[in-house]
Amino acid sequence: SMLHHYYDILEKDRFEELYGDLYIGQHPTEERNSYLIIQLNFAVVNAELNNYRKSLDAHCNTVFNYFCDVYADYLPKGLKEGMNQKNGAVEQLDFLYRECEKNDLKIYLFIDEYDHFTNKILSEPACLEEYQSETHGTGYLRSFFDTVKAGTYSSIKRCFVTGVSPVTMDDLTSGFNIGTNYSTSPEFNELVGFTEEDVREMLDYYRTTAEFH
């Protein structure tokens, strides 16, 4: 993604190649190419409520190990081994951001389709009660975003989250009440979210295929 390459410390030698003829290339910010990137994609997480924790842990562990490998020249020795001794995504992310903080390293965390599996869970009425328990109180998903939030006071200096709807984020609000929803901002109305034209096209389509109630 554009943000990934703009902020990734590993891409600093390609900055002119990628952005030299663009406005952001001619007006660079101080933080360009100064971050270590963690990029999660929850679209690959199993949507079955009983299995999603295991799937989330597996995906995060794969990404965290990749992170340790590609940034090995910047990270302290033994970080990967120490991280893999922790149990699950929550403990591993907590370990990574704390160790990066000790070494004055900055993390940019990307989470794509953060609500992919929770939206599928919500489509099953029988799962609603379990979903609520996971996004409230001591639920695992809630704990994960609590950890992300805690990390923003440490080495996770930036976080960019994308999804289909704000439903899950609303349920996680008190656990992750540090974000800004750009999909409702007029300044970004053609960048994220649906335009009025998009909505009208969808309504016209479904009007011909299903009866509205």
Task: Please annotate each region the language model reported.
Residues 1-213:
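Phosphate-binding site recognition
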